[in-house]
UniProtKB/Swiss-Prot annotation:
UniProt-listed Pfam families: bacHORMA_1
Listed name of the protein: CD-NTase-associated protein 7
Taxonomic placement: Bacteria, Pseudomonadati, Pseudomonadota, Gammaproteobacteria, Enterobacterales
Effect of R35A: Binds to CdnC
UniProt-listed GO biological process terms: defense response to virus
């Protein structure tokens, strides 16, 4: 009786093209949110997309959320994207499926980002070099809570990395 085994090693280099591909999908989600809810502005969407390209390319993104906040809590519609390494062949979903008609009266549009362990372990010089092209600087803030729950609904991937999208949903 014979047995055979083999190993396949696959390496991919994550490029700015891969980062742009994934960031463009997030920008499309934000444009759909804008169409239904009036925010974010075109200029903000462009800046968020540029920021995301820089953070994805550097490997410095942990999570980023875009959406509406009321009483220091995210409400529906809010989208959270979590960066990770792609395991296996992965999925690269089409953007979209933003639910229309949610009540955002009295809420403010907001974005919040957390950083990866690679960012936290980088030297200041490495951070300065990687982040020199950011369109704006974020300031420290407390992470908002969630009024509802998070539902995994999309995965965007390219070049061996992924962004998993979760959406805030109401308990109703």
């Amino acid at each position: 009786m014979s047995s055979y085994s083999y190993t396949v090693a696959e390496t991919q280099t994550f490029s700015v093209t891969h980062a742009r591909h994934m960031a463009a999908k997030v920008a499309t989600d934000l444009r759909r949110m804008q169409r239904f809810y009036g925010y974010p502005s075109d200029a903000d969407i462009e800046a968020y997309e540029e920021e995301l390209v820089v953070f994805l390319k550097a490997g410095y993104l942990g999570e980023v959320s875009y959406g509406f906040q009321k009483n220091n809590n995210w409400i529906e519609p809010t989208l959270r994207y979590t960066a990770g390494d792609l395991l296996g062949s992965g999925t690269d979903d089409d953007p979209g499926k933003i639910r229309p008609g949610k009540d955002v009266s009295g809420a403010s549009f907001y974005s919040f980002m957390t950083y990866s362990s690679k960012y936290l372990n980088a030297t200041q010089s490495e951070k300065d070099t990687a982040l020199k092209d950011l369109p704006f600087k974020r300031v420290g803030a407390q992470s908002p809570g969630i009024n509802g729950y998070l539902e995994n609904d999309k995965t965007y991937s390219a070049g061996g990395r992924s962004l998993t999208r979760t959406s805030v949903r109401n308990f109703v």
